[in-house]
Amino acid sequence: MSSSEEVSWISWFCGLRGNEFFCEVDEDYIQDKFNLTGLNEQVPHYRQALDMILDLEPDEELEDNPNQSDLIEQAAEMLYGLIHARYILTNRGIAQMLEKYQQGDFGYCPRVYCENQPMLPIGLSDIPGEAMVKLYCPKCMDVYTPKSSRHHHTDGAYFGTGFPHMLFMVHPEYRPKRPANQFVPRLYGFKIHPMAYQLQLQAASNFKSPVKTMR
């Protein structure tokens, strides 16, 4: 990013295609070293990455080395993601994400009986690189893969495993009621007895695939 651009690095990053789930972290939060405790041990090129996020002038050596600049850019994205996971557990962060939730920015539950319930991003792990972001439905309380493939490469650790639950602890008034209806399998209009599934599983376990003949 050049110094002539008016948009901040944070706004630029959150505006990238595929980063729609992120909110813009307040710079005051990032500048408070207490909020960044321990992140210097997780992120390579920590100091340069932090300077990039805060739009501080880079070192001259960095400007003359494009390969190094790419590494710093990757580190800045990782650092911002980890800061973001902490920020959205604060009152200010929750308020920003709540607004996006109410606007349906994170998508809607694909389950029919959830009736287009808005969802929230969630991580299945707090460790970067272990799992991509998923979407949590507060109505059926299950998780789903984002519909758009552009979100399939967003690290789940940048949202954390506890974010949706913290949001509803702070704002219980936004917790939806559990679904009133549940799908009931039927055959010729009759409910299928649970024993039928057990019999099907037993039959499947005894089933042997036909031997393929060699041509």
Curated annotation (Swiss-Prot):
Residues with the Phosphoserine modification: 2
Highest taxon, organism lineage: Eukaryota
Subcellular location: Nucleus
GO molecular function, one term: metal ion binding
Locus of motif KSSR motif: 147-150
InterPro entries reported in the protein's UniProt record: Casein_kin_II_reg-sub_N (IPR016149), Casein_kinase_II_beta-like (IPR035991), Casein_kinase_II_reg-sub (IPR000704)
Chain spans, region Interaction with alpha subunit: 188-193
Residues noted as binding Zn(2+) in the record, renumbered to the chain: 109, 114, 137, 140
Predominant localisation class: nucleus
Keywords of the record: Metal-binding, Nucleus, Phosphoprotein, Wnt signaling pathway, Zinc
Annotated SUPFAM superfamilies: Casein kinase II beta subunit
One Gene Ontology CC term in the entry: nucleus
GO terms of biological process kind: Wnt signaling pathway
UniProt PTM: Phosphorylated by alpha subunit.
Description of how the protein assembles with itself and partners: Casein kinase II/CK2 is a tetramer composed of an alpha subunit, an alpha' subunit and two beta subunits. The beta subunit dimerization is mediated by zinc ions.
Family listed: Belongs to the casein kinase 2 subunit beta family.
Domain notes per entry: The KSSR motif is part of a protein interaction pocket that mediates interaction with cellular and viral proteins.
Biological role stated in the UniProt entry: Regulatory subunit of casein kinase II/CK2. As part of the kinase complex regulates the basal catalytic activity of the alpha subunit a constitutively active serine/threonine-protein kinase that phosphorylates a large number of substrates containing acidic residues C-terminal to the phosphorylated serine or threonine. Participates in Wnt signaling.
PANTHER family (alphabetical): CASEIN KINASE II SUBUNIT BETA
Name of this chain's protein: Casein kinase II subunit beta
